[in-house]
């Protein structure tokens, strides 16, 4: 397959899909390819011995158990680095993963998968092209990238297509014979896309992880989308009615609103450690069969708290789309829906949320306080005219609200505040 064969817009697995897999690892690339993603991205820097290492950052600090500059490593020391996969992703991946050399990527994926390669260090473009030529990789199967116009010129002079990153300068790109521009999402408009297409230039936008944003950009006319969650952005593949927390699988659309959370192998749950703020994660993989009438069932457990029983809570936010919900910030523009809270003292609260701002609708009287380390079954039902929020188990209590202000609200976010909170057995029907 060549880039010319792809229907537009297509999705590029940014860093291999960094929200689902350990970024820029061979293991992560294999998952991306196994998911049917046609394009994987690499960030390539020159090493001290002239080798080429694949890593986004200029240091190894964030991604490995070591520290120091990428450029100070040789090819040998590069392969001795340990990717801190479990800590970075919150579980689900083993230790002992290694950052790849670009040669390894070409041996396994060259001419098999479409590659989108950024020359990350200022001296990387020429050796990247040399490596591609040496391995006999077809130029039709590669898009190079750079923010530097000089590097883009070099790529074009060697016969390779290139994305000029960070620009909307269509006139200059056309004059340089550059076939792609790569602006950030906030700089893309329908006018930019129209000007680019009129000049024979395509638009690759970065980095897009939410479907509401994707839909606007597709309507604007973009040709390619870089995404850290490429399966979620590409379509409905991977959507399901229940979680896979027990298998420690990061499903498509499991995106941090304010935090990522982590898996707990001891009981097959996922959740947040105690924190002096509110944290929340989108569960974009959940998809009800009928968005107009949904029932969400889950088990919630509260662990250590750092506030009183009225302040500490676990919560569910049901929203109209996948705008992030950031309850501890000054607001969450675009976040509309309903907030369901279980407080440490046992109170159930329901709020209507408009542009991220909650307004109380109803509360139960304080019931039996939550017992630390004990799961509580919860059920939320949304009909065309109302909401039911039920706590089961030893305490059977329901809050009923007549409100139809937001419909449908099929998008699930899970969170907690001032407490360690775990969730499991999440089912949306």
Outline where the language-model segments fall:
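Short, aromatic/His-centered strand-loop micro-motif at the edge of beta-sheets
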Residues: 352-377
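Secretory/extracellular carbohydrate-interaction modules
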Residues: 273-351
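Short beta-strand segments enriched in hydrophobic/aromatic residues
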Residues: 46, 121, 300-304, 319, ...
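Phosphate-group recognition and catalysis centered on beta-loop-alpha active-site segments
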Residues: 1-265, 292-294, 385-388
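Short tryptophan-centered beta-strand motifs in secreted/extracellular beta-sheet-rich domains
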Residues: 203, 298, 371-391
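Flexible glycan-contacting loops in extracellular carbohydrate-active proteins
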Residues: 399-425
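Short beta-strand micro-motifs enriched in acidic
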Residues: 45-49, 341-345, 381-383
């Amino acid at each position: 397959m060549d880039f010319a064969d792809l229907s537009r817009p297509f999705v590029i697995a940014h860093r291999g899909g960094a929200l689902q897999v350990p970024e820029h690892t061979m293991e992560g690339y294999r998952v991306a390819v196994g998911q049917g993603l046609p394009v994987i991205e690499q960030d390539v820097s020159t090493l001290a011995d002239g080798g080429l290492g694949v890593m986004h950052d200029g240091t190894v600090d964030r991604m490995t158990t070591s520290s120091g500059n990428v450029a100070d490593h040789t090819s040998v020391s590069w392969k001795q680095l340990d990717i801190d996969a479990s800590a970075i992703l919150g579980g689900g991946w083993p230790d002992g993963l290694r950052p790849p050399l670009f040669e390894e990527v070409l041996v396994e994926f060259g001419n098999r998968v479409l590659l989108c390669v950024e020359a990350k260090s200022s001296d990387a473009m020429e050796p990247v092209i040399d490596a591609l030529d040496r391995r006999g990789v077809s130029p039709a199967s590669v898009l190079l990238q750079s923010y530097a116009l000089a590097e883009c010129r070099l790529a074009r002079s060697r016969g390779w297509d290139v994305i000029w990153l960070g620009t909307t300068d269509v006139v200059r790109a056309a004059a340089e014979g550059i076939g792609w521009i790569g602006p950030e999402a906030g700089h893309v408009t329908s006018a930019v896309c129209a000007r680019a297409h009129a000049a024979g230039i395509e638009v690759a936008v970065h980095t897009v992880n939410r479907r509401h944003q994707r839909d606007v950009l597709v309507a604007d006319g973009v040709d390619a989308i870089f995404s850290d969650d490429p399966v979620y952005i590409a379509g409905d593949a991977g959507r399901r009615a229940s979680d896979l927390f027990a298998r420690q699988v990061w499903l498509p659309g499991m995106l941090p609103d304010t935090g990522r959370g982590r898996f707990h192998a001891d009981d097959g749950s996922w959740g947040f450690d105690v924190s002096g703020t509110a944290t929340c994660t989108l569960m974009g993989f959940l998809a009800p069969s009928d968005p107009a009438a949904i029932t969400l069932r889950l088990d919630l457990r509260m662990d250590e708290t750092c506030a009183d029983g009225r302040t500490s809570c676990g919560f569910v936010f049901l929203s109209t789309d996948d705008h992030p919900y950031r309850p501890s910030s000054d607001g969450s523009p675009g976040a509309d829906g309903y907030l369901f809270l279980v407080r440490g003292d046992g109170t159930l609260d329901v709020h209507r949320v408009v542009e991220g701002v909650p307004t109380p609708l109803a509360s139960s009287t304080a019931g039996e306080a939550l017992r630390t380390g004990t799961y509580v079954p919860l059920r939320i039902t949304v009909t065309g005219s109302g909401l039911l929020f039920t706590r089961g188990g030893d305490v059977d209590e329901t809050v009923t609200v007549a409100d139809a202000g937001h419909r449908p609200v099929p998008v699930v976010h899970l969170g907690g505040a001032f407490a360690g909170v775990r969730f499991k057995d999440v089912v949306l029907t």
